[in-house]
Amino acid sequence: MLNHATADVELTTFQGKDLIQNFIFFQSPLPTLIKMKKIKIIELASVLAGPSVGQFFAELGAEVIKVESPKTGGDVTRSWLFKGEKGNGTVSAYFTSVNWGKKSLSIDLSNKEERAIVYKLVKNADIVIASYKSGDAEKLGVDYETLKALNPQLIYGQITGYGLNNPKVGYDAVIQAESGFMSINGEQGANPLKMPVALIDVLAGHQLKEALLVALIERMENGNGKFVQVALIDAAISALVNQGANWLVGQNEPKSMGNLHPNIAPYGELFSTKDGRQLLLAVGNDKQFKNLCRILEISDIAQFSTNQERVVNREELNEVLSGKIELWASEELLETLVDEQVPAGLVTTVKEALDQRESHWFLKTDGLTGLRSFVASGFDRLSLSPPPQLGQHNQEIIDALD
């Protein structure tokens, strides 16, 4: 565990001139680099939101121990295989997405003797990450109040579906339905659509990362632990951003519009090129639109000269643009648009997008490839161990406690 008393840093400048036991700072032409080499984390979380936070800290150099129940076969996503997937022991493709760099401890928390192992770990831990619904952590004896008694400096971060006072089970798809996201996703007049990734889980994970980092900074200042909690429903509502503001400020209720944007045009529209590719435009200002018209040789733009006019006359504008864009080959047009700083891109498959990424954005080991959780530049990119088999590190972890 880290000793906050060694921390002597001016938090307002955060220039990295002081050596802090729980952070190592050093100067660089890029922003100050931070390694959390001595942070110890106990992960009592499963599925995606909580484990994504654990992997984030592992990528920063923290030691992350993932506690899993042998009764359930560990994290449920170990069994979430796509059709035709054979899996690798107790590791599925889904499980690998957020579990790199962790050690797996398979114990039954309902068993007093086995739960005592977690209590020993907590005494020297900095952070606990949990994803229990309301009341479950207390039943298992791993709630914040219980663990704080063992370690007053402990920071406890919990993901819930609906908050601490609502025992309803929260899954990403349900939250998408209840938060308004599905109502504005999909084509106009069609059935609501769920997003094809668990975006609410991802957003909640980011919210918890931020909360835990703030709690760590506070602890450097006052030496106190802290309980922080993020509900999936809250993370979803906060992510409505401009769509939420359209209602709160303008009383304009958001509705599904397909790819279209309620406030900007042409923004999100797809157009077919001469070679059959789909090109998306995301024009954000009048200068970009004028550049687009010059490239496409559109001279009569009187009814489209401002963004508000383009939003009002969207259908007429799209007809004009479609007739021009279909005359161009996709790569030639895209290159021209990029050169003239007109935001545009070709629709790309997931496979194509991943194949185009540079290798340093990936985690690789033993023939396995994964996506990094932390992608900001200016920091060391650490190599991580592959996602663990269930209970792979039991003996190592228990031996270290003796």
Language-model-derived ranges and their functions:
Residues 13, 32-221, 389, 393-402:
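N-terminal helix-loop segment corresponding to the beta1-alpha1 unit
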